[in-house]
């Protein structure tokens, strides 16, 4: 298959303060060491590596109610949003590498600043749409979408550090794929707002092509618009992605993951990609666990930019 040339901007976001344990900030380093930049170029893509962002700790970052590290996370997501906006203004597909999933506040808000009509495919075991009042633990990695949803604006307190965020999504702008660990407060939000999701129950009963057929028909069937893929590695089964912060059994297989990413690529509408939450051995994962997870994450990411299981060559 001949692959069209892409213009890609890669941003590293080595950040872990959206949750309490370190290790996830190693994700950008691991994907680069695995050859992400070189392999993207091998497919004929024009790639600009924007390097890793620097995220300063905010002093005296006391909890806001039960929300932990609010100012540090808020500042990090603002820095990332500005970087994503710059990549999109340069007319490049933005590939962001995390990092924990609190970063999605920045990647999606930064993308929407240039393409306000975007839609989101959220691949994850978790819904990540708790509000500060529904979150059982106060960790912001489980709350990014609540800051972005227009329908939740009235429910959101003024969390310090997030003053810059303007909600940019409506319920019709997002589809979840692979949910299987959803908090009660999140389930209530999904049902109340009518957000479309294909949990692992639906995924198990639908054929692989039907999952993406439903997703794409819902989001871009009538009106073509930019797609933002926010991909948490724990959306896949731990057997193929064991080194992640919140593994959850019963996830998507390697084959199912590749199909999803390949089909998103084929739309020609993929405009932003997050690859989120690969852990390091500092968390107790074995070297083999990390290697398997990074290889899986690399293959999924490259599938968004032209890598196909049938083989490929760059167009001339």
Curated annotation (Swiss-Prot):
User: What is the top EC class of this enzyme, as a single word?
Assistant: hydrolase
Q: Return the similarity comment.
A: Belongs to the arginase family.
Which NCBIfam families would you find in this protein's record?
Answer: rocF_arginase
Q: So what does this thing catalyse?
A: L-arginine + H2O = urea + L-ornithine
UniProt keyword annotations, A-Z? Arginine metabolism, Hydrolase, Manganese, Metal-binding, Urea cycle
GO cellular component terms attached to this protein's record: cytoplasm; cytosol; nucleus
The UniProt record lists the keyword Secreted: no
Question: What EC number(s) is this enzyme filed under?
Answer: 3.5.3.1
**What PROSITE patterns does this protein map onto?**
ARGINASE_1, ARGINASE_2
* GO terms of biological process kind: arginine catabolic process to ornithine; urea cycle
Q: Which cofactor(s) are needed, names only?
A: Mn(2+)
Record organism: Xenopus laevis (African clawed frog)
The entry's protein name is Arginase-1
Subunit-structure text: Homotrimer.
Q: Where is this region: Disordered?
A: 1-26
Q: How is the cofactor bound?
A: Binds 2 manganese ions per subunit.
Q: Which residues bind Mn(2+) 1?
A: 101, 124, 128, 232
Q: Which InterPro entries match?
A: Arginase, Ureohydrolase, Ureohydrolase_dom_sf, Ureohydrolase_Mn_BS
| Induction / repression | Slow-response activation by thyroid hormone (T3).
**MF GO annotations:** arginase activity; manganese ion binding
